[in-house]
C-alpha cells in the first residue's frame, strides 16, 4: 500500500501514452465494471460448484491465479488494465464457491446479507473519508500493511498444512476473531484506496491507466471486506 507514496515519482510505471487528467468518477466507473464481472462470474459458479467435481478441482488453481493477478497488478501498475478483468473473473469463481459453502452451511440468506453489508460498508467508508473524519497518514498505511502481510502469512501457512485454530472455520468464536481482524484490515485498505484516488486526481500528469490501477486496488479491498463479512455473519448465526 506504500506504493501510493512512490507512484507520483514513478510515472513510467504506468505509462504516459494518451495522458489526461485522472478523474475519480472514472475510477468508480471502472470499479463498477470489475464488480459486475465478479458478480456474474460468482452467480454462474454458485449453482454449478456443487454439481461439478471438475469445477471443484478448479477452485484452488483459480484462487492461485487470482492471487498472481493481484500481485502483478499491484507491483506492476501498468499491467492493471490487463490483469484486473482477469482477476475479477477468477475471483468471481472463487467467491462463488466460497459463498456456496457458506450458504450450504448456514443458510442461503447469508449471501445477499453479506452483499448488502459490503455495499453499505463501502459507501459508509467513502462518506466518512470525504467528511475528513479519517486521515490516512504514513503510520496508518504502515499499520494496515503490516497487518495485511501478517494475516496473509497466516492463511498461506494454513494452506501449507500448519494448524492455526479457527482460520479455516466457517463459524464459531475463533472464526469470528479472524473475521473481525480481516474486516478491520479491509476497511483500512478502503480508506487507503480512497486516499490514493484523491491524491492521484490532483496530479494532472498521471496517465489514465492509473484509473485501472486504482479501481483494481479497490476491488481487492472489497473482496476482502465481503469475505470477512461472510465469516462474521456465519459466526454470529452459529452462536445463536
Regions inferred by a protein language model and the residue ranges of each:
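A hydrophobic alpha-helical transmembrane-helix feature that marks the membrane cores
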Residues: 1-240
